[in-house]
Amino acid sequence: MENTSSSREQKNKRKYKKTTIISVLLAILLFCGFGYGTYVYMKTSNLVQKSNVNLARGEKSNLREETVKPITNNVSLLIMGIDENQERQKEYNGAFHTDALLLATFNKDDKTVKLTSIPRDTYTYVPVEKKKDKITHAYGSGFVKNGKDGGPQASVEAVEKLLQVPVDYFVKFNFNSFTKIVDGLDGIEVDVPVEFTEQNSKDEPDAIHLKKGLQKLTGEEALALARTRHIDSDAMRGQRQQLVIEAILSKLKSVGSITKLEKIVEAVDGDFKTNLAMDDILSFYKYGLNCSIEKIQLAGDDLYL
């Protein structure tokens, strides 16, 4: 009986020891996961804070009666892609153009995002210039007049004047950050509407060639698709930009790895500007997980002025 009791006690001890080891290992893994998640969150927060631009108008659009917040209110986000790269720094001296302008309006009630493409050569009143001009010039004019933070402000004002809707937030990317974001997502799936050849982000001619059809694009290829404008019209170019943005948003929804998110954070470091706070970005991300996208194209004619 004593041997049986002793044997049972030894088994129970081994079982308890095994359970304890597993519990400790799980606790360590959970702690490491939480710790790494906190690290990435803090890293992202620091990046956003470093990239933050306070518009001269303040937090609230002049077309709003009061300040709004993502999820709580219907809000808008202006996406700016500027034609900045290392080769153009000397030529432009900071006064770059907006190669892409898309206004995303978020409706909290029906969970939709309306993505409106604004052709770069849209001829409209540009407040910073106090005259009519191509909307693509607003960014550079704002930079020249009011310094590096004047570019986003001028583009926001021009879009508000054109559409007569408030622009609550903005994000500004350049060639470098755009290509790295797409590569950080391991590429994006796009149904390329037309075969074409285009220069790359370094302005090397005929460096990118894409065939028509559904395919996975690298950062350079996605940029070429968004930029090319000599094969048809400015309006069609806007539609291609919508396809690319939609593909990026779709891929972001499926990102399940925190390491991929960290890659994206590192990719845009120093190459983007925004007036979004970290909590705002998380709100937009949560909103985007369950929303549908409606693409809108401004009506107009292609005319040479």
Enumerate the language-model features and the residues they cover:
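Non-catalytic, solvent-exposed segments at the cell envelope interface
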Residues: E2-A27, F31-L305
